[in-house]
Amino acid sequence: MVHIFTGILLGLLLLATGTQAQFQFFEQMFGGGQQQQHDSREQNVPSDSDWYQRTYDNARCSNYLCPGTLACVAVPHHCPCQHPAVEDKFELGDGSAICVSKGGFKFGEAARKVELARKGLL
């Protein structure tokens, strides 16, 4: 009788522990993560254009200062893309350039698609 009572008590204890672990999991997923979200918001860069304007104004460039990258180049269409790992640069015939997403295409494919679009074929 004592063994049965001990077994039942042990089973209830294990069940309660497992249930508590499940509720902690759901609490963390749906409500307990608020503290983590608060911490990540404190680390974000403030949405303030004053930093960019100060950096732009203090940049020294005797030629053309690219507004997107703050690179100093000879002419505007030589400006590099802001995200070269995921963008291809395509120089247009009028002395300007655009950066387009590579989108998983092979090298040069984005530029080919831009050219097709300019001709009205895409």
UniProtKB/Swiss-Prot annotation:
Which species is listed as the source? Answer: Ajellomyces capsulatus (strain H143) (Darling's disease fungus)
* Keyword Methyltransferase among UniProt keywords: no
Coiled-coil intervals:
none
- One of the GO biological process terms: ERAD pathway
Q: What does this protein do?
A: Probable component of the endoplasmic reticulum-associated degradation (ERAD) pathway.
Q: What is this protein called?
A: Long chronological lifespan protein 2
* Secretion signal, residue range per the UniProt entry: 1-21
**Keywords of the record:** Signal
Q: Which family does the record assign?
A: Belongs to the LCL2 family.
